[in-house]
Amino acid sequence: MAAPDFDVQQLPHPVPPPDEDGSTFEHNAALKAQYYGRFIDGFLFADDSGLEVDALGGAPGVHSARYAGLEATDADNNGLLLQRLTGVADRTARFVCVIALVKNSKLVHLFRGEVEGRILDAPRGAGGFGYDPLFYYEPFGCTFGEAFIGDKMLVSHRAQALEAMFTFLRSLLSAEVTLPA
């Protein structure tokens, strides 16, 4: 997501990650942003994202990256997901991204993006990462693993959340929005 009117930078030095112990994307995104916000002055954002499958009660959810274990690979996670969906007809799913924006470690706002799709019976495509080869996106007629990266970036859950955040920041900087004290 291009935001030429903003100078987005990474932290200037390596910082060990916090424990992501929340049960929601919102909690984990806020936890990370507030944690990393201690190391800089001003605005900082962090995200938490993952895949929710309706038939699995929203799993893998916040555990998407470590669904099959702490050291699991994408192939391990995809394999476990397919195993748990064996014989399941309803494979509706969504990618979710929540971005937490903080200023001086104080939570300012949360932004959520979602993209709906369904999980196939087998992976298709070598592009993307994570669950992309299993996630079929109807408007494209293919999986995110088969989609052109530029097309995927236009509709992704992360792109939606980022665009919402940049719109908010533009409003804030033009004084259309004010921060609570």
Describe the residue ranges of each PLM region.
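Anionic-ligand binding patches
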Residues: 1-181
